Each structure stands twice: as structure tokens, then as C-alpha cells.
């Protein structure tokens, strides 16, 4: 089940609005 994470997509960059415990480059 995917996590729902609030985020904003700005200037081509995905910016989560809260701390996300994923390693750099990791996808879920």
C-alpha cells in the first residue's frame, strides 16, 4: 500500500512537505 505524502512539484523538483525516510534515489 503506497504512502500518501504531501509534496509540491516546483521547478522540476519533487519537494516533500514533510520528512521522508527514503534514501537518495530510492523509490517506493
Swiss-Prot record:
The keyword Electron transport does not apply. Keywords: Toxin-antitoxin system. Belongs to the UPF0165 family. This is Putative antitoxin AF_1079. The keyword Lipid metabolism does not apply. Possibly the antitoxin component of a type II toxin-antitoxin (TA) system. It comes from the Archaea.
Amino acid at each position: 500500500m503506497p504512502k500518501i505524502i504531501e509534496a509540491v512539484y516546483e521547478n522540476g523538483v519533487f519537494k516533500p512537505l514533510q520528512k521522508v525516510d527514503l534514501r537518495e534515489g530510492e523509490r517506493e
